[in-house]
Amino acid sequence: AFWAAGVLWKIKNEAFMNEYKWIDDLNFKVSYGTQGNSSIGDYGSLGLIGATTNYDTNASLVYAQHPNPELTWEKQKMFSVTLDGKLFHRLDFELMYYIRKTTNMLMGVPYPYTTGYSSLVRNVGGLQNSGIDVKLGYDILRGRDYYLRAGINFNYNNDKVTELFQGRQRWEIANTLVAYVVGKPVMYYLPIW
């Protein structure tokens, strides 16, 4: 089960804000919640047998998917603090700081080739993201039946691998330019020949 909770303070409704007529709206929000990622398919945990004709054009049964009974949802916990509002009847803004921690990350873990598989999706590893989001919007023209609006978004995200599988501190995914290193961001790398 996943859940979330939040608190909103409508600062503009406070008595001390009455003298600031140029501030149309001002809110402060804090939220915390959990969510999951179920990108494992409907039968991702089951051992499956399938038919093939790859051997001398004769039909045969093969192990199509290795059983993975411990496979479960990836879990995320997220905390955010947001300040948003509207100024001068035209300019709106939102500033948000967030921290998201992912555990039981779904990753293709290397598997012995003697099994007939090169990897198996497992719940291993952890990742932490933190950063800020800034959104600005401005109503350039506003009529009864039309409006022209401009907006801009800015995001800064800092990600860090917190845990890998089998006690590893580094893992380079074969045939890609992606590496996971504990304590570092998920990164692209170029090998030196």
What are these regions (language model features)?
Residues 12-16, 37, 50, 102, ...:
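Generic "edge-of-domain/loop-turn" microfeature
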Residues 1-11, 26-32, 79-85, 91-99, ...:
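Membrane-embedded beta-strands that build the outer-membrane beta-barrel scaffold
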